[in-house]
Every structure is written in structure tokens, then in C-alpha cells.
Amino acid sequence: MAGLRPRGYRSPAWDFSDNTIDLLLEFGFVYDSSCMGNDVHPYYLRQGDQASPTEPYVFGRPVDLVEVPVTWGLDDFPPFEYIWGQNSGLTSPSDIEEIWRGDFDYAWRHADGGVYALTMHPQVIGRGHRMLMLERLLDHIAGHDGVAFETIGAYVDRWKAANPLERWKAEHPEYAEPGPRGAA
């Protein structure tokens, strides 16, 4: 519609299949924002991870697809939407503002170069009392030196330029080395 190919992907409900990474790579995607492997620092996704209830977790190999991590704690849906039998959806916006503000303040103090990625749905955050909370939060964030509001794509371009895959793998073996993790 805009004449541009999509560069990034966020999975509905943050679900991945065994084919998701293959498809994103095949269609030239640069980043994903559906996984929770870190709180605020991006990383390269791995292809071929294997999980078993009886064996150690096995890491696959890192691929040239940047993950901009998400978290349920920075998603508007769980606290604000009613799902019968699961949650009331009636959390006060001021309670969520306190949580989101606290997460931002911690990241700003302790996670240099990180990204604070809120997940918001227009039908959820777009109600008057919630929009007022969001305005206060954005004003708070904007009041901090060194904060930039930008698209995930622009952030990923800068991050990739500073963290080429091969160098990143060498500097982050805890994410990058294929093979078993943990005890059986």
C-alpha cells in the first residue's frame, strides 16, 4: 500500500512456528519483534533451537535477523482487556503507568543502547483515560536526556551497523554458540 516492502515482523500473540524464521529470512525481513530473550537489548535470532522436556535445551545457529524483544509487562492487552475467566481487564491506568514508568526508568539507568518497546493495540490503549496515561508516560520518557523516539526499523539499522552478526556472535557466546544448555 505504501510502496515499501515490510522489513519487520511482529507475530500475532507472539507465536512462532517451526517455519517462522525460515519464512522471514526467505522474504528478506530484517527484524522480528515477537520474542522475549532479553528485556531491552536486541539480539540475533537463532534458527533450529530444540526443546525437550527430558533433554537439555539445544541452541541453533544465529542468523542475520535481529530480534527487538517484547515483554508481557509492556503490553496493553493483558491489563486492560476483559477475557472472561482469565482477567478482569479493569486495571487502573495509573497502576500500569507506574509499571511502565518503572521499566523505562530502570532501562534508562542500566541498559545503555537498549530499546523500550511498548506493545499497544488501538482498540485497547485508545480509550480516553488510557490515552491520558500514555500522554503522561511519553512526557516522562521525553524528559530524559539521550532518549530518541524512532521506528523499530531505524533503531535496527543503527544497531546492526554497530553490531555486525559475526562480531556480535564472538562477543555474545551465551546467545550465539550452538549446542546444549543446562543439565539433563
Question: What do the PLM-derived regions correspond to, one by one?
Answer:
Residues M1, L23-V30, R136-H140, H144:
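Alpha-helical structural signal in soluble globular domains
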Residues L4, R10-A111, W168, A184:
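Active-site-adjacent pocket scaffolds in enzyme catalytic domains
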